């Protein structure tokens, strides 16, 4: 195969979005056809720093740790189109102080809450892990009241015995979401039970954009 018709306006886009052009995947780079923005996934943020740990009693905290990370979780204004997606990949360690411990996880773009879910956990001892993966699809762009973002997420946890449970999250924001002003992507966690033995430890977080 040959690389005959690669078009590189993406580098200009990368400067605006703080993305790594070398990290493009999910596209047919080796095709003889010109590359378009369709289905190009570009990493905007990758956590390389220390784990982010949130304990019971800490309040609502962000699992994005921009210190030492690659890229940025800042989304510049007017850099998306109808049909664009944001993708989230996150995993880490989770422990509870007994059964029926609850926490709230929220995904935000600027001031808009794209998803909010209360998760109820069983007794999870040392060695239990979680994954929080999914995407945000932009149905419409523009000002608040016009723009529409829909989230499709899966939060799963696996206990020390290898048993896995899933929460599927499907929510829409068509009131406060907008694409015409700069917005920071955040994912926050807050334990409802304030016992510090409840631990949510984010080990890895990737935030990507699909054009």
Where do the language-model regions lie?
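Surface-exposed molecular-recognition determinants
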Residues: 38-211
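Sec-dependent, cleavable N-terminal signal peptides
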Residues: 1-2
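Low-complexity, small-hydrophobic/phenylalanine-enriched stretches
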Residues: 11-40
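N-terminal non-cleavable signal-anchor helices
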Residues: 7-8, 22, 53, 64
